[in-house]
Amino acid sequence: MPRLRTSRTKRPPDGFDEIEPTLIEFQDRMRQIENTMGKGTKTEMLAPIFQLHHQRSRYIYDLYYKREAISTELYNWLLKQNYADGNLIAKWKKPGYEKLCCLRCIQTAESKFGSTCICRVPKSKLDKDQRVRCTHCGCNGCASCD
């Protein structure tokens, strides 16, 4: 969740006004998801939050690296204010992790067998009738070769 802006915090850099409506929309959708948490397991309830977090980070990543629409100063400010996940973006820049859905899917310490999540396995290596759904974030497959 982004930090609150008060009178004591630094003003956002130039260009923030152009992307602020989209970031506010992401923030409103996050609040809506948090308020409508229903029944189900913990991971099923957290999956929409992980997906929206991924979308917001991907939006900022695309603005800076793909479209080059924002300045370095604004990009660093957005990361510092927690509008995007800097660690996830750092992984997206590495080969093989371009489509990574969340950091939990590559952490081997949190899995039963000490391996990565099933969503990281390429679909060509799985059976055709096998349905892949991540237990952490609800991803349907984020291997870079898919």
Curated annotation (Swiss-Prot):
CC per GO annotation: post-mRNA release spliceosomal complex; Prp19 complex; spliceosomal complex; U2-type spliceosomal complex
Compartment(s) where it occurs, according to its Swiss-Prot or TrEMBL record: Nucleus
Subunit and interaction comment: Belongs to the 40S cdc5-associated complex (or cwf complex), a spliceosome sub-complex reminiscent of a late-stage spliceosome composed of the U2, U5 and U6 snRNAs and at least brr2, cdc5, cwf2/prp3, cwf3/syf1, cwf4/syf3, cwf5/ecm2, spp42/cwf6, cwf7/spf27, cwf8, cwf9, cwf10, cwf11, cwf12, prp45/cwf13, cwf14, cwf15, cwf16, cwf17, cwf18, cwf19, cwf20, cwf21, cwf22, cwf23, cwf24, cwf25, cwf26, cyp7/cwf27, cwf28, cwf29/ist3, lea1, msl1, prp5/cwf1, prp10, prp12/sap130, prp17, prp22, sap61, sap62, sap114, sap145, slu7, smb1, smd1, smd3, smf1, smg1 and syf2.
Protein name: Pre-mRNA-splicing factor cwf14
Gene: cwf14
Main subcellular location of this protein, as a coarse class: nucleus
N-terminal signal peptide: none
Pfam families (UniProt xref): BUD31 (PF01125)
Lineage, opening ranks: Eukaryota, Fungi, Dikarya, Ascomycota, Taphrinomycotina
Keywords linked to the UniProt accession: mRNA processing, mRNA splicing, Nucleus
Gene Ontology BP term (one): mRNA splicing, via spliceosome
Organism superkingdom: Eukaryota
InterPro entries linked to this entry: BUD31 (IPR001748)
Purpose: Involved in mRNA splicing where it associates with cdc5 and the other cwf proteins as part of the spliceosome.
Family, similarity comment: Belongs to the BUD31 (G10) family.
